[in-house]
Swiss-Prot record:
InterPro entries: Ribosome_maturation_RimP (IPR003728), RimP_C (IPR028998), RimP_C_sf (IPR036847), RimP_N (IPR028989), RimP_N_sf (IPR035956). GO terms for biological process: ribosomal small subunit assembly; translation. PANTHER family: RIBOSOME MATURATION FACTOR RIMP (PTHR33867:SF1). GO terms for cellular component: cytosol. Its main location: cytoplasm. It comes from the Bacteria. Required for maturation of 30S ribosomal subunits. HAMAP family: RimP (MF_01077). It is found in: Cytoplasm. This is Ribosome maturation factor RimP. It comes from Thermotoga maritima (strain ATCC 43589 / DSM 3109 / JCM 10099 / NBRC 100826 / MSB8). CDD domains: YlxS_C. It holds the Pfam family DUF150_C. Keywords: Cytoplasm, Ribosome biogenesis.
Length: 150
């Protein structure tokens, strides 16, 4: 089965399982790596953080589906994880959800901003550091992620 077809079938079932468990799918990847084929499913909790138990329960259900359907022709490793503490920010919903959190935003023109997300309104992200506030149009963002705080 082609990789795109595998991804489509896995994503559909992953979304069903995630919805049942009150989770969301952040990403699904299927690719060959140095140790062989890896099916990586990254889950998210829309109202908090992903626990080890969340990963365990999701993984069990996904394994049942994969064993039952048996549509992946070669051996692979299933990995289920969270987006991580330094998770990428993907779109308006994330900027609203993580208001108050420390983030790093790199714009398409190469500027880097590190500060707390203050708000997201009408396509504009407001982020501030100790010295000043910055307003960044979401269309100008090349990449963004949360910064780990200690």
């Amino acid at each position: 089965m082609f990789e795109e077809m595998i991804l489509e079938k896995v994503r559909k079932e992953a979304e069903r399982i995630a919805e049942e468990q009150g989770l969301e799918i952040f990403d699904v990847q299927y690719r060959r790596e140095s140790r062989g084929w890896v099916l990586r499913i990254i889950i998210d909790n829309p109202v908090g953080y992903v626990s080890v138990r969340d990963c365990e329960l999701f993984s069990r259900e996904m394994e049942r589906f994969l064993d039952r359907e048996d549509f992946i022709e070669h051996s692979y490793t299933l990995e289920v994880s969270s987006p991580g503490l330094d998770r990428p920010l993907r779109g308006p919903r994330d900027y609203v959800r993580f208001t108050g959190k420390l983030a790093k935003i790199v714009t398409k023109d190469g500027k880097t901003f590190i500060g707390r997300i203050e708000s997201f309104v009408d396509g504009t992200i407001t982020i501030s550091d100790e010295k000043r506030k910055y307003e960044i149009n979401i269309d100008d963002v090349k990449r963004a992620n949360l910064e780990v705080e200690f």
